[in-house]
């Protein structure tokens, strides 16, 4: 982004027209790039561009310099605050001759343990010395300028509508990471982001995050943006900005922090580490509610039980109202993790856990357990069986339910006997009844038949005589025919 005073645009009727740089500005870009050399101070460059400002648009000249400065590496910062160095020097008052000046410098240098004249003004921009000049082509500088200009204008946005034909999931994923407020619509697919101009606080951070998102929007094959900008000092007016598939924009990887540490990231890590048996999915598939696309922050699931999780952080009143309308129409359970500053009363009748700085994962786990217990008590268990041997584990796995739930809802099927953990067909059981398992090794029988044979042997009247902890001899109970 650029300082607002360097933004170049004109207004025609109610539309904002950005003044992008073009190939006609290549000579200027090359000339300014050539001024940035190792060993130079920024103050020297400022003096050298004065004549260029008289020939070219001074805003464009200053913007090029501003961007190139961000790519420079400067001499290391002072080990001592420069203001402290100046305070120590100025204690001695005005100096009238060179020898007295040198004596004072030596005294202060010795006291502070540093080459003070090297750092005395190092906190001033004009005194910063370049140790590594930027390596960038004039073409890339122009594209970067154009992207920065567009980002700067969008900082004044009240609303930004985005149309894309590809990578829309990536855009939404980034938007969530960046904490941007948005609405998604179907037919045609579009996203409506609330702009910084809708906020009364944190506009700087929000605006910068929206600028970061723009880089992902323009990476789509086909994209279009329509923005409503709020401009004017005394009298505010809303103007429109439209742009589609403009090629002279470039994403550059600059040393900047793209994403802040977020509540969402901490929640995801805590959930993964603490809550076992549940699977958490970040950015699940979108849900369509009344032709609006709703993409929850997370989906957590255990078997057939699905719960969507939405983290409500820094939202405006209007955004909350719109979101609530959608949340109430989603048919699956939704858990809302709510920043307590927003007020819980707005979410009456919904599943809400409040948080202050971070989400208490133990409260989430407790809520999920209560929901799971309620679900298991109300779930309708229906199943059929086929084959000779059917285990409860097999049925539970197919139904995505705990074995104990199946056990509480055992069904009786004609032609089958239910033992402790297995259904066995009567025909197969009769066949086994005709076998003689007397004096056989249990270990060998389990290996030949499977684990179910233990329960079958007990049903048929056999007993086990253990020969240690790992094997037993099967003995026919003489009382049983």
From Swiss-Prot:
Protein name: Endonuclease Bax1
UniProt subunit comment: Homodimer in solution, forms a heterodimer with XPB2.
Note on domains (UniProt): Has 4 structural domains; the N-terminus (residues 1-136, NTD) interacts with XPB, the central domain (residues 158-250, CRD), the nuclease domain (residues 260-364, NUS), and the C-terminal domain (residues 414-481, CTD). The CTD (residues 374-481) is not required for DNA-binding. The 2 nuclease domains are found in the NTD and NUS domains.
Described purpose of this protein according to its UniProt entry: A dual DNA endonuclease probably involved in nucleotide excision repair (NER). The N-terminal nuclease domain (NTD) of the XPB2-Bax1 complex cleaves on one side of a DNA bubble (which presumably mimics DNA damage), while the NUS nuclease domain cleaves the other side, respectively called 5' and 3' nuclease activities. Interaction with XPB blocks the NTD nuclease activity. Binds to and stimulates the ATPase activity (and probably also helicase activity) of XPB2. Increases affinity of XPB2 for forked DNA. Does not stimulate the DNA-dependent activity of XPB1.
Entry binding sites for a divalent metal cation: 265, 297, 310
Gene this chain is encoded by: bax1
GO molecular function: DNA binding; endonuclease activity
Region (Central domain (CRD)): 158-250
InterPro entries the UniProt entry points to: Bax1
EC number: 3.1.-.-
Superkingdom of the organism of origin: Archaea
Cofactor(s) needed for function: a divalent metal cation
Keyword terms of this UniProt record: DNA damage, DNA repair, DNA-binding, Endonuclease, Hydrolase, Nuclease
Taxon lineage: Archaea, Thermoproteota, Thermoprotei, Sulfolobales, Sulfolobaceae
C-terminal domain (CTD) as annotated region, ranges: 414-481
Coiled coil: none
Nuclease domain (NUS): region residues: 260-364
GO biological process: DNA repair
Family affiliation: Belongs to the Bax1 family.
Region (N-terminal domain (NTD)): 1-136
